[in-house]
């Protein structure tokens, strides 16, 4: 009998999770989900305008201030995720391409965290500096890189011995 593990998968809020406009990370998550042994207890969260979602387990997180210069869309996304899932008690929270989402949620939610890097970590807020990446290595339960190139970029200016941490 398989252990029941409840998983929240959080897409970047700019990532579209629809058949008509899916982007790379959304397609990767959808394909990965199809073969997961935990697909009955895995919920995918994102901010998508369309309704033709790639999978039935998708839950939309609305963001009102998406283009606001006065407030943080990331903070609103995280706050709305917390509000929507406050009684869910996820065992694992998977975050795709958004180290800042991890930094926010880690302060508010007790769970194991996994970050997936699909793109250059040195171009993302929350993982640009060596200190930010060291902090992630120390605080995230697992970091997954979708390519060797992305992994090499993450460890740029860091001790290569940390790759096996």
Model-derived segments and spans:
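Alpha-helix capping/helix-boundary segments
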Residues: 50, 99-101, 149-151
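Extreme N-terminal starter segment of soluble prokaryotic enzymes
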Residues: 2-7
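An amphipathic, basic-hydrophobic alpha-helix
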Residues: 67-92, 128
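Short His-centered aromatic/hydrophobic patch
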Residues: 95-100, 117
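Membrane-proximal helix-turn-helix segments that form the acceptor-binding/catalytic region
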Residues: 31, 82-83, 126-143
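N-terminal strand-loop element at the rim of the active site
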Residues: 11-19, 31-72
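A short, active-site helix/loop in glycosyltransferases that binds the activated sugar's phosphate group
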Residues: 134, 140-164
